Amino acid sequence: MSSRSYKRVLLKLSGEALMGEDAFGINRSTIVRMTDEIAEVAALGVELAIVIGGGNIFRGVAPGAQGMDRATADYMGMMATIMNALALQDALKHKGVDTRVQSALNIDQVVEPYIRPKALRYLEEGKVVIFAAGTGNPFFTTDTAAALRGAEIGAEIVLKATKVDGIYSADPNKDPTATRYARISFDEAIVRRLEVMDATAFALCRDQKLPIKVFSINKFGALKRAVSGEDEGTLVHV
């Protein structure tokens, strides 16, 4: 049985998630599988917005950016997110999912600019909205963009798709005794020094009482289970 527990959600996808087993770029089979799951969630009637990163193409804090002006490197990273957003939109279109891309940087010939009322209208019409170019400002991560856009559109939860299936007491790759938290409060995560998002994004979600669910994008069906409110990943709550 499948049902939705949330009416409107913000999904944060890292650019690295699009690489699959590749070292760079977009892995075709990975994006096809990912969009299958997104389409399945959209079919439940969930109003879905997505913030996507660009780390599979370029990151402002990556070794390749060393020696560059940080703001310039960050703008390059923002443009990488636009490329990913267009690829994701194209893949969703082939699944019959009506999708719009809005960018925090103006490239009018390619994508429409981020306009909050239009984004809200698209969501209400059942369209998937992909937010590209982060916040449009250097020195802010796409995690922060996810928290910001989530708050702006009135999302009920931020779903952070990662390579691990939740938040653990220690690094599960290094400590075999590490245990996964099913639920944890914002304050407890701070006390335990657990890295959920970068500090700015985490503080924004906490201040806006916007819960975060961390789950694995590589686990089949995890997105649907997270949206359905099942015990999937880790829920960070107020």
UniProtKB/Swiss-Prot annotation:
Quote the Gene3D superfamilies the UniProt record gives. Answer: Acetylglutamate kinase-like
Per the record, what are the reactions this protein catalyses? UMP + ATP = UDP + ADP
Q: Subunit structure, per the record?
A: Homohexamer.
In this chain, UMP is annotated as bound at 54, 74, 135-142
Q: Which InterPro entries match?
A: AceGlu_kinase-like_sf, Asp/Glu/Uridylate_kinase, Uridylate_kinase, Uridylate_kinase_bac
> What EC number(s) does its UniProt record assign?
2.7.4.22
Q: Record's family?
A: Belongs to the UMP kinase family.
Query: Which keywords are on file for this protein?
Result: ATP-binding, Cytoplasm, Kinase, Nucleotide-binding, Pyrimidine biosynthesis, Transferase
Protein name in UniProt: Uridylate kinase
Residues bound to ATP are 12-15, 55, 59, 162, 168, 171
Q: What is its main location?
A: cytoplasm
Please give the pathway this protein is involved in: Pyrimidine metabolism; CTP biosynthesis via de novo pathway; UDP from UMP (UMPK route): step 1/1
Q: Record keywords: Cytoplasm included? A: yes
Organism of derivation: Bordetella parapertussis (strain 12822 / ATCC BAA-587 / NCTC 13253)
Activity control = Inhibited by UTP.
- Indicate where this protein resides in the cell: Cytoplasm
Q: Specify the domain of life of the species encoding this protein.
A: Bacteria
Any single GO molecular-function term of the entry would be: UMP kinase activity
Q: Which CDD domains match?
A: AAK_UMPK-PyrH-Ec
